């Protein structure tokens, strides 16, 4: 790797020859050149940066450039990159073997940590958030004997067929209503409603209540950009579901263990039936989980009739990284995340206001987004009013100044506890030029 180039606005050339060469090679080998669509930079243009190293708040690309990381691997890296305790835990676990296909002490310890921190009484470990939500829905259907599921437009629950209808995240990024390959039969039992609209939920149950197995919602929406639930929206979802014999599934894959020790539940104490987790609980490795009340979880095989399995579920390396991360994530760390997110958001908002750029700063705990719009953002429709060209210009100016943002206007920004004064100074120095670029790009 070449020496790190100096940080600061305008000091990074737009060209990234090593990343460009890697991307060209990747496109010949991997569809679109990436293994998850948003990484391709299609929403913002240009060449995706191929990262070779992370340390604390910093990412280093193949061209030797250093960036303050405000993506944090899409949420998991609350401690920052290569935290010494996590690295040591991984070294120790790997020395004992990387996978056994049998129960391990580590998965028991990780399950105990999750149960201790959250309202779930039992938890099943899996390898991805998609697996977690897919399995939770199967379990809800098995418990209720019903087929239909309510989800909300702009909420993303992984890429299983039934949940891609009007999804956020990559689907929002690419402007797709759903996905080819999803059959009418697979999507036919999914009812899609506007987010934050409790009257629409009441109407759906009035029309089809006896067929509805569950409502699934993000604890706080983070995949159409960050949109917090209004008032007591989540609690009212629980009340409506329970009054009609249905279950409430709260998707905390993104918020879980990021916004508080107990995830979003630590902020609103919503009485759901099932919860899904991921991202932070793996400490940067592939791990996820779903859990809930013991009588519901008892319906899972081998204890019950609802089948779910996974070859690498409870992988010892993922459990070691996740358990170490969670044990380091105390109340002081969450205060630091909250404070850092507030500072970064204020710096960005002040710069955009000074440049005359219409915007809305939207928080859910320490997750946040900037919507380039005059409109109040409360759901997917209002999120889509933003000026994407303004975000593109803003993104590239920040990238060239050494700040790595999510390469989509419809994603959350994430901070880590490793962000220090040096990193904040680099962000602050980058923002005026980026705000000016957004002003020039607005309406373009």
Curated annotation (Swiss-Prot):
Catalytic reactions on record: (S)-4-amino-5-oxopentanoate = 5-aminolevulinate
Pfam families named among the record's database cross-references: Aminotran_3 (PF00202)
One biological process term in Gene Ontology: protoporphyrinogen IX biosynthetic process
Main location per the UniProt record: cytoplasm
UniProt keyword terms in alphabetical order: Cytoplasm, Isomerase, Porphyrin biosynthesis, Pyridoxal phosphate
InterPro entries associated with the record: 4pyrrol_synth_GluAld_NH2Trfase, Aminotrans_3, PyrdxlP-dep_Trfase, PyrdxlP-dep_Trfase_major, PyrdxlP-dep_Trfase_small
Tagged with keyword RNA-binding: no
GO CC terms in record: cytoplasm
GO molecular function, one term: transaminase activity
Residues bearing PTM N6-(pyridoxal phosphate)lysine: 279
Subunit note: Homodimer.
Family: Belongs to the class-III pyridoxal-phosphate-dependent aminotransferase family. HemL subfamily.
Protein's UniProt name: Glutamate-1-semialdehyde 2,1-aminomutase
